[in-house]
Amino acid sequence: KGTFYIVTTNMYSQIDRNKPNKTKSNTNFIITAKNPAGPWSEPHVIEGAGGIDPDLFFDDNGKVYFVGTHNPGDMYSNGIGAIWAQELDLENWKLVGDRHSIWEGACDKRHTEGPHIYKEHGKYYLLVAEGGTSFHHAVMMAASDDIFGPYETGLRNPILTSRHLSKKNWVHSTGHADLVKLKDGRWFMVSLGKRNDRDGHSNMGRETHLMPVVWESQIVRWQQISKTKWEPVSYLFPVVAP
């Protein structure tokens, strides 16, 4: 408490003359400050933390977790991505314990990235971006009783997207979201999105959008309670408010 953290990726490309394509590499690091206006610390590089768009989760038991992405294949060729989590030692800025691959996404399971974990209603909620950052951009969410899973997805995923709308819709490519809870109990979502002009151009690129959300019950699975009877298992999930 009393410390601000920024965790981000330093990503770069370099040309290998022996290969026709660019070689991509990255480093994830954390900086801290007592005031968001600064001064900020020197970067603490987290060795072994690959992937992009990481986040930190501070659990109520005092443990801190680094949440990032990894690629079962080549993310830049086949789009497959997954989310991993591992405990982080903030005293020494090192990953400790085992690494767990916790989710691959909900719908098309491509370019799963930008993870955020929240603990609400007695469960861990994992929010991710999926589908790339263009017209198939979307926000997915899953829930679990344990931070390392297994995570179960609501049947109403994606909880935010514009992929089903015309490319002429005035806001499109919505995704890469985060949730914020106000002191009065209200919830809001911030996400990326593009605004089109009359000719369909997005001159401002990706902008940040703000919208209210509410938590509603969603079925995650059906469980058999007798030979002839099944009942739904439901969790609360955030949805964009009207």
Where are these regions (language model features)?
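Carbohydrate-active catalytic/glycan-binding domains of CAZyme proteins
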Residues: 1-242
